[in-house]
Amino acid sequence: MSPDEISTRCATIEECYEFMLAYAGQGLTGDEGSHASGEVREFLRRAAQALLGLAEVYAAAVKSRNLQPAEPYLAYLAVLEKDAGASLAAIQLVLAQNPISSQLIDNLNASIHLRALLTDLFLVDEIMKPQRTQASGAITA
């Protein structure tokens, strides 16, 4: 696991969400014949891939960086795992639809599961930033 894998996964999921906001605003009834149609599926696929094993990557980062006290970090692992799993299920459900309309994406954007996940990611990414900075400083010093 690279030191920035959590950050990379967070960015992939956030980029998908931002693209979905734009896609939802287009008022498309389906995803055929639109340049955005292939893109929305690709963004969703990448987000789904980033979600796979996300909690395990977080746990490995806590362990490899010896974050102390470990208990609060590991307790949050259950929250992240639940929210990532629910979001992945929702994304996979949308990917199974043909076509993917703007309204469907708007409903996915409004999903409490996806919103909870995004909040989790913002929190985890922000907490890990000082850890990345300290790790980088230790390597270059």
Features from the language model and the residues they span:
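Alpha-helical transition-metal enzyme core signature, strongest for iron centers
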Residues: 13, 47, 51, 84, ...
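Charge-rich, acidic-biased intrinsically disordered regions
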Residues: 34-39, 66-76, 107-113, 133-141
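Amphipathic alpha-helical binding modules
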Residues: 87-140
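Core of compact, soluble alpha-helical bundle domains
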Residues: 1-64, 139
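A generic "alpha-helical surface" signal
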Residues: 4, 11, 45, 78, ...
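Amphipathic protein-protein interaction modules
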Residues: 59-109
